[in-house]
Amino acid sequence: MPYRLYQEEKQKAVNILNDIKVKLYNRGWFPATSGNLSYKLHDDPLYFAITSSGKDKGTVTHEDVIFVDKDAKPIEKTKLKPSAETKVHSQIYQRTDAGCVIHIHTVNNNFISQLYFEDGYVPIKDMEMIKALDIWKEDAFIKVPIIENFFDLDRLAEEAGKSINPEVPGLLIRNHGIYAWGRDEFEAKRHVEAFEFIFEYMRNMIIFKGCKDIF
């Protein structure tokens, strides 16, 4: 049965996404209109707000956000196009308890995803920042999944869904970027910041040591 989204719900989502995207744009994480972010509005049926395609994320306009269903189709009439990777967001919402998803392209996450691609994951341990990912274990060791950057976006979404590690709120796409999520916008932002801190540290250590075996 269709669920009616109220204007207040939609405006809240727009405000949240615009606030996050401008903050992360100012950190250089949305270059050349790349990346996307979304905010879940309803579980069953799944409805979420997502940034529209091809927009400069350093500015705020009335055409920045579109509302879609689990099949990445707009739930209301619009001339806007949802992000090309909307189906990946849908997979994350359907397979996790995420309430917000952030996808960014940076030099650090591209470097790390390419270097560790053949392993299928990025190994991370012995770092205090792991706690920022809600992983509170002594001697914590995590594996951030990496998948191929498939041109076919349906296949990309399918592989992303199959590769999600429920214990790790992030997924890398080789030479593309990272998806990070959280139960709300605060968690999602914290998680993507933690991943980027970790990847920057790893990249610097790899260059310094001359090998990827840094832990």
UniProtKB/Swiss-Prot annotation:
Pathway: Amino-acid biosynthesis; L-methionine biosynthesis via salvage pathway; L-methionine from S-methyl-5-thio-alpha-D-ribose 1-phosphate: step 2/6. Its EC number is 4.2.1.109. Keywords: Amino-acid biosynthesis, Lyase, Metal-binding, Methionine biosynthesis, Zinc. It catalyses: 5-(methylsulfanyl)-D-ribulose 1-phosphate = 5-methylsulfanyl-2,3-dioxopentyl phosphate + H2O. Pfam families: Aldolase_II. One of its GO terms (cellular component) is cytoplasm. It is an enzyme of class 4 (lyase). Zn(2+) binds at residues 103, 105. The keyword Transmembrane helix does not apply. Binds 1 zinc ion per subunit. GO terms for biological process: L-methionine salvage from methylthioadenosine. Belongs to the aldolase class II family. MtnB subfamily. NCBIfam families: PRK06754.1, salvage_mtnB. Catalyzes the dehydration of methylthioribulose-1-phosphate (MTRu-1-P) into 2,3-diketo-5-methylthiopentyl-1-phosphate (DK-MTP-1-P). This is Methylthioribulose-1-phosphate dehydratase. It comes from Persephonella marina (strain DSM 14350 / EX-H1). The lineage of its organism: Bacteria, Pseudomonadati, Aquificota, Aquificia, Aquificales.
